[in-house]
Amino acid sequence: MVHALAAETDETAQAADIVERFLVASMVPDPQTAARYISDELKITFTGGRKYRHPRETAAFNAKRYKWVKKKMERTDIVPAKGETIVYNLGTLYGEWPDGTPFDGNRYVDRFVVRGGKIVQIDVWNDSAERLIAKQVIEA
């Protein structure tokens, strides 16, 4: 079965803009600015099933995993739903591991649920764990 995406509306365009602004603030990282775009009921699930409630928590996790990390946002897909908009942001991560080794081309998919002009849910997937495992195997 093939489903066509609905034409972009003001609501879906606004949801995509909210997500992009959130991601830009998160990459600084500026959790305070990122928090402008989230609901008080925000639920974040990171890779490995890690649960968070606020951008400052994900920034703290990323500070342990990476020396620094940024996103090359390549595509945004918008899926309108009843009472909410689902926004997928896809691309690659680049930056440095804690030991200073650079990396690039690390795929990611972020899924956002936007309701009432706020992000209420974020699901994050990326290849970082796979790359860290491969790096350890190569160095061992």
Features from the language model and the residues they span:
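Hydrophobic pocket/interface hotspot
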Residues: 22, 33-35, 42, 58, ...
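Beta-strand elements of well-folded, non-transmembrane domains
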Residues: 95-99, 114
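Short, surface-exposed coil-to-beta transition loops
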Residues: 71-75, 103-109
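Low-complexity, intrinsically disordered terminal/linker segments enriched in charged
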Residues: 6, 121-140
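Residue-level structural signal for beta-strand termini and adjacent loop
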Residues: 57, 108, 124-127
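A solvent-exposed, acidic/Ser-Thr-rich amphipathic alpha-helical stretch
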Residues: 31-85
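Short, low-complexity N-terminal intrinsically disordered segments enriched in polar/charged residues
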Residues: 1-36, 40, 138-140
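A short hydrophobic beta-strand element
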Residues: 83-93
